[in-house]
Design a protein with these regions (language model features):
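N-terminal glycine-rich FAD/FM-binding segment characteristic of electron-transfer flavoproteins
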Residues: 1-255
């Protein structure tokens, strides 16, 4: 593989119902740092239907170019249309790096792209940097979080990584930034589509997304009982925080 043909840092922009997800803005901020170190550009992949107007938000967040990929097939996320679209872009544009949020969508999409392209994927990264040789250094927890492993994809491109939400810091939006928006047409092979969305029902729940919280008060087995969590809730109210718990407490049904 001639790695010199592969340039720029690409970010898959996850949007839901036309709303750009925070993890995408966080990845654009990190992509900006990586691209500056490589003297390359940040390219945002904006897939969907009727979402092209989000391009200015992405440019303000750090993108140099927004590839607007609009199609009826992309109106809602399903695996095959999105995988086909991004695979086509990778073959045509040859990105050096592709970053994807480690969300339910990203964890579905990333491995499929990796398999189709024939490159590696480092999942659930908590750190990204550029080596002296210009390779992407991808750091992730290993062995249950007891070790941190730094992984390099030396022989294949693009270098792919999924990144946990809330790990990277989004840059302050700069509305004065200038960028370019390009329309991209995808040639879908609809014979491979296996899933059709018949109806979407949104779950009604009074829960807070703790990844969006600025302060957390968290408890584990030491709290003991549901009554013990009431003390944590009182503390959280004083601090203006949200309450969270360890996996053991959630599995036990205490929270």
């Amino acid at each position: 593989m001639d790695k010199s043909q592969y340039k720029n840092v690409y970010v898959f922009v996850e949007q839901r119902d036309g709303v750009v997800q925070n993890v995408a803005l966080e990845l654009l901020g990190k992509a900006r740092e990586l691209a500056d170190a490589l003297h390359e550009q940040v390219i945002a992949l904006l897939l969907g239907k009727g979402v092209k107007d989000k391009a200015d938000e992405l440019i303000a967040a750090g993108a140099d170019v927004v590839l607007s990929i609009e199609a009826d097939e992309l109106a809602q996320y399903t695996t095959e249309p999105y995988a086909q679209a991004i695979t086509q872009v990778i073959h045509e544009r040859k990105p050096s790096i592709l970053l994807i949020g480690a969300t339910s969508i990203g964890r579905d999409l990333g491995p499929r792209l990796s398999a189709r392209i024939g490159t590696g994927l480092t999942a659930d990264c908590t750190g990204l940097d550029i080596s002296e040789d210009g390779d992407l250094l991808m750091t992730r927890p290993a062995f249950g979080g007891n070790l941190m492993a730094t992984i390099i994809c030396k022989e294949h491109r693009p270098q792919m990584s999924t990144v946990r939400p809330g790990v990277m810091r989004a840059k302050a939006a700069d509305p004065t930034r200038k960028g370019k928006v390009e329309d991209v047409k995808i040639n879908f092979d609809k014979s491979k589509f296996r899933v059709r969305i018949l109806e979407t029902v949104k779950e009604q729940k009074n829960m807070i997304d703790i990844t969006e919280a600025k302060v957390l008060v968290s408890g584990g087995r030491g709290v003991g009982t549901a009554e013990g969590f009431q003390t944590l809730r009182e503390l959280a109210d004083v601090l203006g925080a949200e309450v969270s718990a360890s996996r053991a407490m959630v599995d036990a049904g205490i929270l």
